[in-house]
Every structure is written in C-alpha cells, then in structure tokens.
Regions:
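Short, Lys/Arg-enriched N-terminal segments with co-localized hydrophobic residues
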Residues: 1-4
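Hydrophobic helical h-region of N-terminal Sec-dependent signal peptides
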Residues: 20-24, 28-32
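A composition-driven surface/loop motif
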Residues: 14, 30-336
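N-terminal Sec-pathway targeting helices
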Residues: 6-23
C-alpha cells in the first residue's frame, strides 16, 4: 500500500508539527547555552583567572580591591596586590585600567610568566593605564620566558614599574605591537632580566610618543648571550618638551646589542634629556634622522664601539648639547 501525502493529509500535518517542535526545542537549547555562556563571561576580562561578569564585577576578588565598570569600560585597582600563577590580567577587549594607591601584580609561574596581556589573536586592542596611583608588575620566578606587559596599543598615564627575571630563552619588559604613548607626566621604569636568546626592555613595533614631562627608564641585566635590547622603536620616536629618556644595556657577553634603536625619525624635544649607554653596541642607532632641539641634552656612550651614535640619515642639532662620538651618513648639521 502506498500512502500519498498532501498538504491536507493527517500524516503530513503530524510530521510538520513534529519538525516545528524539534526546531523550537533546538532554538531554546541554543538560546539557553548562549545566555549561560555570556552571563558567565560577558566582558572578556580575566583577573587572576577569574572571568569578570555581571555577578562579580563590583568586587571581582572578594576583597574590595578590584572592580569593573561596564558603562565606562574601566577596571579599577584600588591598593590591590594580586599574585597568580598565570597571566594576572588578561583582556580580549579594549580596556582602561585605573590605579588608586599602590598596586602590584605578581605572576608566580616558574616556566612562563606574564603580568598583563591585552589582545585577541590578531586583533589589535587598546590598553590604557591611568589614575593617580601606581602599578608595579613583577615576574620573579619564571626561568623559561617572561613578559611584563604586552598590548598592541598602549597608553601609560600613571607611574608604572616592570621587573622581569633572568630567563633561559627570552624576557621582555614591555611589548607593543603597534604603538606606545606615555602621557600625563608619567614615569615608566623597566628593569629587564638577561636571557640566552632574547632580552628586550621596551619593544614598540610602530611609533612611540612621550608627552611633555614624561620619563622612561629602561635597563637590562648583565649576562645576555643572545640579542640584548633596551628601547626598540620600529617607527618614529617623538619626545615632547622636558622629557627624560634613560636607557642602559649590559651587552658585555654578546655582540648583538641595541641600546636605543629607531627605524624612523628620532626627535628630541626642547629641554629634554636622553642618556644611553652600552658596552659593545652603539648606544644609539637611528635609521632615519636624529633631531635634537633647543636646550636638550643628548649623551651617549659605548665602551667598545667607535661610534656612540650611528645614524643612517643626518643628525640635526637645533641648539642642543650633544656628548657623543657620532657616525652619521647624512652628516652632522648644526642649526643654532
């Protein structure tokens, strides 16, 4: 016997009803899963491994020192001391961190340690550190690899200190895949460990800008046998008025040192101070031009290199005091 189903048959209506019911059940199931997932992790921010969500955002750690405001996208550290075995603060989204009082982040991992990481795969994310307080990031125990802070685009508007250990492979203080801005008279201090392969205190793969009155102090420990870097800027380096840049590397055990390396223009603002020192490498290497403005002071010293400053372009002096031996392919131009 052959049953022919048409839109008017009872069997057809039953089958359609069953299919509609199954569709509704599947939709409800996925809706519940979706809601539960995003209720658990709606923001993409983790503090000491805890996903920040609407249930805990007002007191993430339970001690009143860390809280998040969804409306203005600000994660506040209020006299917080956080120790964690993995990445201490991880954000998949653009994030502002506000500092109140003295704050410290410590990653205790003995293999790979990182203090703050902002980013999601290949998507650039912005991280801003601000407020009237201060932040210290320490990676005391890692012996494989370490990174104090990594963010594609970083703005520092509060005092920041990063301390990384000696590592077998590599150690990085601050890594910016796109840009670095230091503003609001902030002081950034990086004490970077030594490594057998790669040691870099501050690495910026784009432009770096230091606003008026800001300070960067970057140092590396002795003992690196691979690449040893202080401040590396793959784009342009701009220093505003009355800024301070103090960079020193101990590259005595390697011939792959770069104390200050700028791929583009290096502009030193009026009244600013630059101090750079290395053992084997040139203290400053610039592959664009160096422009030192009125009343600035530029001091560079390399113990074992004939040139304290190497420049592929010209070194243009607009009334600054320069204390260094200079090798400039484009010459040294004094324009008082």
């Amino acid at each position: 016997m052959v049953i022919i189903m048409t839109k008017g048959t009872k069997v057809f209506r039953i089958i359609i009803s069953v299919l509609l019911a199954l569709t509704m059940l599947c939709s409800a199931f996925f809706a519940v899963v979706f809601c539960l997932y995003f209720a658990k992790d709606p923001y993409g921010i983790y503090v000491a491994g805890i996903a920040v969500n609407r249930d805990n955002n007002e007191d993430i750690l339970g001690d009143g020192t860390v809280y998040y405001n969804e409306n203005n996208n600000i994660l506040t550290l209020n006299n917080a001391t956080i120790e964690y075995e993995d990445t201490v603060v991880y954000s998949k989204i653009d994030l502002h961190i506000q500092l109140i009082g003295e704050n410290k982040l410590v990653c205790t991992n003995e293999d790979y340690g990182i203090g703050i990481y902002a980013g999601d795969y290949n998507l650039n994310k912005d991280l801003a550190i601000m407020g009237d307080g201060s932040l210290t990031i320490e990676i005391p125990n890692a012996n494989g690899e370490a990174a104090g802070l990594s963010a594609p685009n970083l703005i520092v508007a509060a005092d920041l200190t990063v301390i990384t250990p000696d590592c077998e492979k590599m150690t990085n203080g601050i890594v910016c895949d796109s840009s670095l801005m230091v503003v609001n008279e902030a002081t950034v201090t990086v004490n970077n460990g030594a490594a057998t392969k790669y040691s870099s205190a501050v690495r910026v793969r784009g432009n770096a800008f230091f606003e008026e009155g800001t300070t960067l102090k970057a140092f590396t420990n002795p003992g690196t046998t691979g690449i040893c870097k202080g401040l590396t800027v793959s784009g342009d380096l701009f220093m505003g008025k009355d800024t301070t840049l103090e960079v020193s590397i101990d590259d005595g055990t390697t011939d792959q040192g770069e104390c200050i390396r700028v791929s583009g223009l290096m502009e030193i603002g009026i009244g600013s101070t630059v101090t750079a020192s290395a053992k084997n490498a040139s203290a400053i290497e610039c592959f664009g031009a160096v422009e030192a403005n009125k009343s600035a002071t530029l001091s560079a010293n390399s113990d074992n290199n004939d040139a304290d400053i190497f420049c592929s372009g010209a070194v243009v002096n607009h009334g600054a005091e320069i204390n260094a031996e200079i090798d400039a392919i484009g010459g040294v131009n004094n324009r008082d």
